[in-house]
Amino acid sequence: TTITKGLKKIGILKGNLNQLIEKEAYKTFYMHGIGHWLGMDVHDVGSYNNKKGDAREFEPGMVITVEPGIYISKKLKQVDNKWKGIGIRIEDDVLVTKNGNEVLSSKLPKEIADIEAAMLTV
């Protein structure tokens, strides 16, 4: 819903918000999952389901990413040229603990001005 609202606000998606959400119009720009396991490798292997096929429950010590984002193809005719070729994902890495979770990336910048300021330092 948040991504659809944002894409509508800047004019990339047009039409009735509820209809855009219902038809999953965001998927043109969000063609990936919400995250993945994080471990020994950047995209750690591991099943998202248990042996019965049900969603696997989180256990203390697991680390997952939460990384919503969008990618706007240069080939999309219905999109204004100023948006074409843009891609962004702002990731959080989350450690599952015995009592809940800990956002390992909580001190990293998330707001546009903060990200741009950080980019100027590299």
Regions inferred by a protein language model and the residue ranges of each:
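Active-site neighborhoods and metal-handling regions in enzymes and metal-associated proteins
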Residues: 1-122
